[in-house]
Amino acid sequence: MGDPAGIGPEVIAKALAGREVQRLCLPLVIGSVPVMERTIKALRLKLTVVPVHGHDPVSLKGNMVAVLDPMETPLKKFKPGVAAADTGGASVEFIKKAVHLAEIGCIDGIVTAPINKEAINMAGCHYPGHTELLADLTNAKESGMMIVGGPLRIMFVTTHVAIKDLSKLLTQAKIEKAIRLAHQALTGLYGIKKPRIGVAALNPHAGEHGLFGNEEARVILPAARASQARGILASDPQPADKIGRAHV
């Protein structure tokens, strides 16, 4: 569900009101039953919430929506759109439950609704976002964030950091890792035999040979060349205003 005070419940309700999701899978909402009921009522959707307990098989008909609430105590009253420890903590519990169900084979995949990073930190969960939390919960040796839109798939070298800190955080090893994970995802998850990976520059005009910064020559180009040597079809650093058109 994401943060109950956020847009997650609304997005989920509207998605489940259509037929596309049901054609793809048997959806299970992990979140607050009362929040889903209030959201559906406010949106005037023809959906009925069916509370689910434990790991029992779910049988749904028509416009039924299965909701599993892992919270031991009901959520206190909260204000929509306002960060709070209670809702932040709840969103973390929802994620933990989803990961557990996936690990024991009860569900095949997880789709996350937005969390509020301020709220989860207020609740004592000091993660900058979903990616880092999921990696920790699954004891992943490596992880990365890839966003997908149409034919474009973007893998990040850094996540959830201030722009002023980017230069000092970029290393050749981190860039090589991102390129390698992108290649693994494209070949393994998407079945693309020989994916082309455009490596983005950091500075305007790819640094213009050091005129606008040296990160390209110092770490990005060496990482790209090392990846090329391993057989990955990675480009040399490309300016941001060019890379999308060139590699779609």
Predicted regions and their residues:
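FAD-binding core/adjacent interface of flavoenzyme oxidoreductases
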Residues: 135-149
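Conserved beta-strand scaffold positions in the cores of enzyme catalytic domains, especially
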Residues: 66-67, 143-145, 154
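Contiguous, glycine/small-aliphatic-enriched amphipathic segments in soluble metabolic enzymes
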Residues: 1-130, 173-247
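Ligand-binding beta-strand-loop-alpha-helix segment within the catalytic cores
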Residues: 147-177
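A generic structural signal for well-ordered coil/turn residues at beta-strand boundaries
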Residues: 61, 142, 150-153, 193
